[in-house]
């Protein structure tokens, strides 16, 4: 998530970078405990197999912190929008959700996120009454996720399209 979010310019990429580094420290401490303390060191080296830092098929020489990317936040709150299953980001313009069908009856998400510092308000509007949205308005400091589904009882048979607008 860190690298994807960094490519998208999300400020939350920095949270994931910190978390990766924290968990690497925890893993190192757990390995040391297992090797030196547990059962008086009886199992030393049993948990020392290299398991962090793989970037290709061959085994690295030692564990290493996975590469993380940090984002420099923009100086003002800036909205970014990304839909489930797509790396593309749009501050405005068109993005498409996956196709809905009444057999799976699943929902898809849209992330509204900040690329800068501060907060911004957003509103969600739909052009069709059968579009079911989990959140119609909100305030974003880092990110907010909305879920989009279909109320199949309000929809006529056949293929149809609807438009969802996200604006500040």
Which residues fall in each region the model found?
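Hydrophobic beta-strand core residues of beta-sandwich domains
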Residues: 100, 138-140, 155
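Catalytic domains of carbohydrate-active enzymes that cleave complex glycans
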Residues: 1-114
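Extracellular Ig-like/FN3 beta-sandwich strand-entry sites
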Residues: 105, 143, 157-161
């Amino acid at each position: 998530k860190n690298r994807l979010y960094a490519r998208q310019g999300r400020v939350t990429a920095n949270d994931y970078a910190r978390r990766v580094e924290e968990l690497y420290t925890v893993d190192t401490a757990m390995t040391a405990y297992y090797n030196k303390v547990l059962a008086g060191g009886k199992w030393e080296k049993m948990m020392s197999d290299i398991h962090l830092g793989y970037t290709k098929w061959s085994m690295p020489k030692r564990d290493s912190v996975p590469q993380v990317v940090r984002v420099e936040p923009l100086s003002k709150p800036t909205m970014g929008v990304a839909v489930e299953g797509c790396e593309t980001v749009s501050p405005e313009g068109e993005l498409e959700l996956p196709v809905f069908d009444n057999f799976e009856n699943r929902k898809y998400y849209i992330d509204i996120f900040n690329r800068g510092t501060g907060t911004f308000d957003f509103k969600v509007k739909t052009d069709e009454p059968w579009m079911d949205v989990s959140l119609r308005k909100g305030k974003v400091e880092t990110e907010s996720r909305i879920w989009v589904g279909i109320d199949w009882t309000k929809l006529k048979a056949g293929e149809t399209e609807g438009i969802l607008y996200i604006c500040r």
